[in-house]
Amino acid sequence: ELAVVQSAGAILQWDMETKMPPKGVELKSQQLAFLQKIAHQMLTSQEAGKVLDAIQKDSEYDSLDQVQKRNVYLARKAYDEATKLPEELVVDIVKQQTVGVNVWKKAKAVKDWKLFMPELVKIKELTEKKAELLMDIKGAKTPYDALIDDFEPKMTADNITRIFDGMRKGLTKVMDKVLEHQDVDTGFLTRPVPVPVQEKIGEQMADFILYDIKSENACGRIDTTEHPFTTGYYTDVRITTNYHENQFMSSIYSILHEGGHGLYEQGLPMKWMYQPIGSSASYGIHESMSRFIENM
């Protein structure tokens, strides 16, 4: 039931970004906040806590297989973290994110950053409250580490710095070699390509990578949005792109990139559907799948 509620929220977010009329933002924020409220109540219920306690204390716990133990671990992690967050804060974050995205679109359209700044500050303040509340249960040294764990479990800012410092040494050498060759004619990249033509190319690229949007058993679709993203769950995973007539490669790369995300989500084992383990491992893994398709 929790997975169903969360997947319903994902599709509502997709609607907000793709099909929602301008006047619908307030209603959409209420809808998303309500679903988040239900999900939070399900996660933090006394019954959920009692069930987890009973499972972990049961004499048969050690006989569970690896997948079963992983499910228990992930359920316990979600429960422990959710119980540290007040329902009001959880709801406020979702509402502000919804309003913030809408204002960001308007600010981007008129190229006025100041329009978005107040909403970004509100999101930042709410997120800081969340991070501070989660530090202890996550064993994080800093609020930022607590937030990183949401996206890349067990990762820290110190480890990221160490990894990036190591990568920089090799990448700098590669960039130096690239910069030695700047006499390449890239004029074709800005040649005007009508949007309908780009759409056909995008559909062909999706078909090439086996992201199905056409068959009677299709689990995907491609829509237009301000900023490309992927959302959905197992048999309904949707991607978006945007089109610029003078930058046709933008839509191609985004379809390949988001298609990679979509294929990863659709490729999760069906036997894990509705289980805690039946979700993406981390954002790092997710991005590796999307960049593999995009770059290869």
Regions found by a protein language model. Name each.
Residues 1-155:
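A well-structured
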Residues 9-16, 75-77, 180-181, 235, ...:
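Short acidic (Asp/Glu) and glycine-rich catalytic loops that position anionic groups and cofactors
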Residues 20, 274-279:
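Short beta-alpha connecting loops at secondary-structure transitions
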Residues 28, 164, 195, 245-248, ...:
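Active-site-proximal structural scaffolding
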Residues 93-248:
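Contiguous, non-catalytic segments that form substrate-binding/exosite surfaces or channel walls
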Residues 135, 243, 250-270, 287-291:
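Active-site recognition of the HExxH zinc-binding catalytic motif
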Residues 208-217, 262-271, 296:
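Secondary-structure transition/capping motifs at alpha-helix termini
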Residues 279-296:
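Post-HExxH zinc-binding segment in Zn-dependent metallohydrolases
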